[in-house]
From Swiss-Prot:
Name of the featured protein: Protein-L-isoaspartate O-methyltransferase
Gene Ontology cellular component list: cytoplasm
Phylogenetic placement of the source organism: Bacteria, Pseudomonadati, Pseudomonadota, Gammaproteobacteria, Enterobacterales
Organism: Escherichia coli O6:H1 (strain CFT073 / ATCC 700928 / UPEC)
Catalysed reaction, written as an equation: [protein]-L-isoaspartate + S-adenosyl-L-methionine = [protein]-L-isoaspartate alpha-methyl ester + S-adenosyl-L-homocysteine
Keywords for this protein: Cytoplasm, Methyltransferase, S-adenosyl-L-methionine, Transferase
Active site (record annotation): S59
Protein's cellular compartments: Cytoplasm
GO biological process: methylation; protein modification process; protein repair
Origin superkingdom: Bacteria
InterPro entries, alphabetized: PCMT, SAM-dependent_MTases_sf
Alphabetical list of Pfam families matching this protein: PCMT (PF01135)
Function per UniProt: Catalyzes the methyl esterification of L-isoaspartyl residues in peptides and proteins that result from spontaneous decomposition of normal L-aspartyl and L-asparaginyl residues. It plays a role in the repair and/or degradation of damaged proteins.
Length: 208
């Protein structure tokens, strides 16, 4: 049984078009309040983005569910996340696949996310402090790549790290941003625009 607050959120997500029950089950299983500051715990199950410090945010549950659904994951999918942030999206992915690789440019956020994931007994995650624009070449190729911040254009390194048939989901743009889905087919990349969004920018480089 889930709480009334969780059930209300799941009902809202279904009404917004989220159909993948495995994704919804993962959202119900991950305690979002563990990924926000104490001051925001009462709002953890509201369908809104919340600040997590360092100028970053935890995405609204709808966007987490939408982007995860677009990845078309199977338990065997090899997944790369760019922008670990609070670790919330990471935890959702960890409930759906056997292993998740995640890159975070801000060392403090990476450390906090690792601690939260460990406290929730989610040990099928590898995190790395690094430049998300470069992906994680040593672990490539990936069946699915998700980016939780917006670059002005799609990073070439991420497209090349997709396996055949792989899917990249990310927000793209500066003042006006759109959620894009990129699918690799042979030497081609098929790009679809999903919807207008608003994310923090994907900054190049690392931050200690």
């Amino acid at each position: 049984m889930v709480s009334r607050r969780v059930q209300a959120l799941l009902d809202q997500l279904r009404a917004q078009g989220i159909q993948d029950e495995l994704v919804l089950n993962a959202l119900a299983a991950v305690p979002r309040e563990k990924f926000v500051d104490e001051a925001f715990e009462q709002k953890a199950w509201d369908n809104i983005a919340l600040p997590i410090g360092q100028g970053q945010t935890i995405s609204q549950p709808y966007m987490v569910a939408r982007m995860t659904e677009l990845l078309e994951l199977t338990p065997q999918s090899r997944v790369l996340e760019i922008g670990t942030g609070s670790g919330y999206q990471t935890a959702i992915l960890a409930h759906l696949v056997q292993h998740v690789c995640s890159v975070e440019r801000i060392k403090g956020l990476q450390w906090q996310a690792r601690r939260r994931l460990k406290n929730l007994d989610l040990h099928n995650v590898s995190t790395r402090h690094g430049d998300g624009w470069q992906g994680w070449q040593a672990r490539a190729p990936f069946d699915a790549i998700i980016v939780t911040a917006a670059p002005p254009e799609i990073p070439t390194a991420l497209m090349t790290q997709l396996d055949e048939g792989g899917i990249l989901v990310l927000p793209v743009g500066e003042e006006h941003q759109y959620l894009k889905r990129v699918r690799r087919r042979g030497g081609e990349f098929i790009i679809d625009t999903v919807e207008a969004v608003r994310f923090v920018p994907l900054v190049k480089g690392e931050l200690a």
